[in-house]
Each structure stands twice: as structure tokens, then as C-alpha cells.
Amino acid sequence: MPRAVAGPEIERLIQLIARLPGLGPRSARRVALHLIKKREALMAPLAAAMTDALGKIVECRRCGNVDVCDPCTICTDTSRDRRTLVVVADVGDLWALERAGVLNAPYHVLGGVLSPLDGVGPEDLNLAKLVTRVHEDEVGEVILALGATVDGQTTAHYITDLLREAHVRVTRLAQGVPVGGELDYLDEGTLSAAIRARTQM
Amino acid sequence: MEWTDEGIVLGVRRHGEGNAIVELLTRLRGRHLGMVRGGASRRQAPLLQPGNTVSATWRARLDEHMGNYALEPAVVRTEVLMRAPHAAFGFTHMAQMLHLLPERDPHEGLFLTLGAILDAFEDRESAGRLLARFELALLAELGFGLELETCAATGSRENLVYVSPKSGRAVCGEAGAPYADRLFALPRFLVEGTAPPAGDVEDALRLTGHFLLTRVLEPRGLGLSDARAAFVSAWRRSTAPV
């Protein structure tokens, strides 16, 4: 057990920073030291921003996104195509799709994917609201933007079953060779999916 | 400690930021967990998908440690499991059932059965028959095997058409006729290994479902999984006349 080099407040700060993704104890010390050195320019605004965000962040009751208002900014954006609904597993996936800027539709965040061995069943996901939204909003197409994993696609099949009665077009993202991917380095599963999903030139 | 064995990936849990804890059904050592360093990386993700068969080398200082796995792909089945709903639901159900096995208890028969089923699972028509066979094998491995070779009442090996819901033993047509409404139908393919009509597969799934529920799941406070119901529904759709 290394000896503490600073008071309990600073040690606690380091311990909390070390719990952030991508940071271990050493990098947490570096981050803490950087914040301490820039107390006025960085630490104070960061603390204020975090306090402010903590008090205001809410989960959108409509789609499951996180924002400072409910319904969220995306749900209230009238320029989005309401006939399409994009289903994602997590808020991180929503942000990734928004970054790409290829869709102009509202989202529905499930809060994970089915994983029975981890104890995640249908009742743990935001599925009931999805079915309600599809019926109430007269959605024409549901895009299942879920990960290309067995759990992700099992969830996609489950949702397809749930929406069978809604008579809505259900699509999923294509799977295959990533941009910049060389065939030599691809795994057999990806190659197999890419060959099956080949398109005519 | 070190050994190398074949294993089928049942599940993967992220451990910390870069590692993963992988649960395998190994051929000689049963359900066995181990950590894969860098298992949460993008490079390892295609290999560490449920349903794949891998060659696993396990190392640990002591036998009771969780230990580390070094894995190499042997059979990659991800594409089929992701594409076919009945295969995805069927595998999920089988993995859940295999989770009931005690850790590190060898079940080579189940390993071979699961591998053979996964290799043929793409064929929708045979998927129902294969799942029923898996459930029969699982019941037997858990000590609740059904006796479908001789009649429980007369000892006869002929005309076995029913199964008792209480004893799990076959009953012949003559002895079972007065109680037919309370007995399960015994699908011929479970005894003879012939290709069954869809109705027989329905009977087989009803039979194995009943014994899984009453003998294995209910005593543990569990019920038949959503994945099994979803499999049956997907399989029915695929075999329904157009």
C-alpha cells in the first residue's frame, strides 16, 4: 500500500478520478495535479459545470436519451423525420450516429441489449415504450442500430418479433467490411456477413 | 497449472476496461471461466462471440484460481447466430440452460451435442428437433433422464406412444389408452432417430419443456426462458405452410 502523499481531500479526488474510464491510479494523479495547478482556470469551472449538470441532467421519458430537459432536444426537434425511428442500445450509440450526421430521425434508447447470462432480460430494457411509440407516432420504419454482436442481433430479432403486429418496416444496419478494412485482416464472421450482404455494382 | 482444450463460448463479461471474463463449455473440463487479457478490445471482439468454438489454453498458479485464457478460433459461427432468429434464440436458451451446470464438472456428451447442434442450426426445419434432443441430453446429464425405451406399465418395447408426466417413462398404447388425455405423446423420432414431421417436434418440445420446468427450473425458482418461447415462435413461423 503506497503512502499517501497529500491530504485526504486530494487523495479522495485522485481515487475518484481513477474510477473514470481510461484512467488508472497513475494517470489519475497526473490529472489531479493538472487540476490543482490550474485551480482557477480549470478546476473551478469544471466543478461548477459538473454541479450544474448534476442538478439538471434528466432521462427523457419519451426516448431514454439524457439531456437537461424532458422531452429531450432531439424529441422536440420538429425538423426530424417522424416516420422513422432509430433504436440504439445506449446513449453513446446515439451520440455516435449524431456525429456521423447521416440520419435525421428521432431515437429510442434501449438502455442495453439482451444478455440472459448477465441477467439482462426484456423487462430490463426500454421496450414497452418503444412499442407504444411505434403505434402512437405512426412510425413507418424502425431502424435497429444495434451492435454486430450475437447479443445485439438477438435483441434485434426480439424487437422484430415485438413489432410484428405493428406492421412497420423493420430494418437493421448492414454488416461487413469496415471503411479502410483490408480483407486479409478481417475475421471469418465479418467476411461471411460481407459476402452474404454483397451488392450489385 | 496449464491445460489446452476445445471450448464453446457461452458468454463474455467485460472485466475492467480492457479485459473480459469468458465462460466456455470445454470438452473435458465442463463449464469453465477464465480471464482474457485484452478481451474487450476490438481485435478480440469477433472471436469472443457466443457460439464460437475456440482452442483454449488456460493458465493459473493454482487450480482454484480463475486463471487466464489464451484463445484461438476453431469454428466461427457468429454470422449464422446473428442472421437467423431461431438460431440466436435457440443458442441463448441453450447457454442459459448450460449455466445451470456446476462449474468445472465435465460433460463431454453435452459439449459434443452442443457443437453438433450449432453446426446444423442454420437449417430451420431441423432446429426444433435438435433443440428437443439437446434438452433431452441436458435432462439426462442433470440426472433427470427420461426412460423412453420400455413401457413403464408392461415392460414392452413395442408401440410406445405416450410418456408419463410424473415418472418420465414411456407408456405403450394399450396401457396408456385409458389415461391418454393426461399423458404426453411420445414422438417416434426421439426413440428411432427418424426425420420427424413438424407435429412430432411440437410434441417433443412440449415434453422436454415440461420436464425441464418441473424437474430442473421450478426447484430453483426459475421458469422457462423468454429465449425458448422466442425460439419456438421463430421455428413455428419458419415451418408454417406459406
Curated annotation (Swiss-Prot), chain A:
Q: Where are the zinc fingers (C4-type)?
A: 60-75
Q: Which CDD domains match?
A: TOPRIM_recR
SUPFAM superfamilies the UniProt entry points to: Recombination protein RecR
Q: Does the keyword rRNA processing apply?
A: no
- Any idea where the Toprim domain is? 83-178
Q: Which Pfam families match?
A: RecR_C, RecR_HhH, Toprim_4
Tell me the keywords, alphabetical order: DNA damage, DNA recombination, DNA repair, Metal-binding, Zinc, Zinc-finger
Domain of life, per lineage = Bacteria
- One annotated GO molecular function: zinc ion binding
> Which Gene3D superfamilies does the entry link to?
3.40.1360.10, 6.10.250.240, RecR Domain 1
Q: Which GO terms describe its biological process?
A: DNA recombination; DNA repair
Summarizing the function annotation, the protein's role is: May play a role in DNA repair. It seems to be involved in an RecBC-independent recombinational process of DNA repair. It may act with RecF and RecO.
Q: Which family does it belong to?
A: Belongs to the RecR family.
Protein name (record): Recombination protein RecR
